A protein has these predicted regions:
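Short conserved beta-strand and strand-loop elements enriched in small hydrophobics
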Residues: 40-41, 84-94
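Extreme N-terminal tail/first-helix region
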Residues: 1-30
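N-terminal first-folded block
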Residues: 20-46, 168-176
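A short mixed-secondary-structure module that forms the rim of ligand-binding clefts
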Residues: 62-87
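A short, compositionally biased
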Residues: 33-36, 80-84, 144
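Juxtamembrane boundary at the C-terminal end of a transmembrane helix
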Residues: 177-183
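Short beta-strand segments
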Residues: 35-70
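Charged, gly/pro-rich active-site loop segments
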Residues: 1-10, 93-177
């Protein structure tokens, strides 16, 4: 991915995707074209500050899986290794989970293909079509790609819970309705 495209995704993720998920609009953002996205809440390995990372994902056998397109250089990936227990804001709810890397080659192949298919147009940014590439070619392409399994441990804080932002739009709509009805 070119530096320009990477920067565009960074801006889109930071100023649109993360706020929309924190406001509770995650269920309205997923589509086959745009991809299915979750927001990972990590703890900064140096700062200790909560960081948010929108990621494409797949659910398989009760676990949530993600891949690190930036390989091992992504900050969120490094943060996970410092603190592998995270909260994940999925469109249907929030989970508290523990991360582990997938090492089994068959599982890596199956999961990577599904995550890339679930990524919509972004799934093609690896330089191939995840729907049509052969298993052998895909295994070669993903040799250095971290595949991460998140095993759910419990429920996390969602947009409507403490620390979420859903209260903001609910309050705004309430105020607007009161103003309109008072006229």
């Amino acid at each position: 991915m070119s530096p320009l495209v990477r920067r565009i995704f960074w801006i889109l993720n930071k100023f649109f995707m993360v706020p929309m998920f924190r406001l509770g609009f995650g269920p309205f953002l997923g589509s086959p074209f745009g991809g299915y996205i979750l927001v990972l809440k990590t703890i900064g390995r140096k700062s200790g500050v909560v960081r948010y990372a929108p990621l494409n994902y797949a659910i398989y056998k009760g676990n949530v899986y993600c891949i690190s397109g930036g390989r091992k250089t992504s900050d969120w990936y490094k943060n996970l290794h410092a603190n592998p227990e995270v909260e994940m804001i999925l469109p249907g709810g929030t989970l508290y989970a523990r991360m582990e890397e997938v090492s089994d080659p068959d599982e890596r192949l199956l999961i990577t293909r599904q995550v890339l298919k679930n990524a919509g147009f972004a799934g093609f940014f690896e330089g191939y079509n995840p729907w049509h590439i052969s298993d052998e070619d895909l295994q070669l392409k993903i040799a250095d790609l971290p595949v991460l399994r998140f095993h759910p441990l419990g429920v996390g804080n969602g947009p409507s819970d403490m620390g979420g932002w859903a209260w903001f739009w609910m309050l705004a709509i309430t105020v607007i309705l009161i103003v309109l009805l008072a006229r």
